[in-house]
Amino acid sequence: VVFLLTFVVALFSLRLLSLNQEKDERLRAVYAAESTISRVSSQLNCYLAESDFIKKYIESGHVLREEEFAAISSNMQDGSSVIKTHELAKDGVVSQVYPVAGNEAAIGLDMLHNPARKKEANLAKNSGMYTIAGPFELVQGGTGALLFDPIYTYSKKGERSFWGFSILVLQWDNFIEEVELDKMEDAGYRYQIWKKDPYTGEKIVIAESEEDFPGNALEVACSVPNDTWYFEIIPKA
């Protein structure tokens, strides 16, 4: 009887230890996921801060000439080459681009009606919050994401009206490198970040570790403006 009781207590202790270890591992994984998403959001906010001068300039009622736009945008180009292009879209239609060379195909693109862009563009317009579209193939070539930042102007009566967008086109591979997702693998995790296609609801993989990803990972839902990103994470075997 004493042996049986000791055996039961030992099993219970092992099970309790296992549950505590699983809980600790889950908490560490959740923290790693949320910290990574926070780092992504912080980096996006840095890019937006760089374009904020142009946004405020337009909101104050000034007309931005081509040479002024080019001069300001040239100073926004970051050393890591994440910002591929800066675009202004008056009434949602791309009217100014920097640099022009290599990005001519983007001029005249109607973001509010383009089949691959309109969902996120209209979300940004209607909510007043910046919205990320992509990653996807860009009309000017390469893979990137669009950061729609809506601009509004006010009449003398204080009535607000939609002016258009300040749009940052991000080189996606450079952006992923900039936010240091490889640190997840260095910390001993495999991961996959994905979101739902706004048109089909299908899964779009935003980034993932190089190793094959299993189906029994912990999933953490993280909010970004006008969207939800899903972070699946699991310790390496």
Per-segment meaning from a language model:
Residues R26, V30, E59-Y230:
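Intrinsically disordered, low-complexity polar/acidic regions
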Residues I234-A237:
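Membrane-interface helix-start motif
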Residues L5-L64:
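Juxtamembrane extracytoplasmic/periplasmic/luminal helical "stalk" adjacent to the first N-terminal
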Residues V1-F3:
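Alpha-helical transmembrane segments and their helix-membrane boundary motifs
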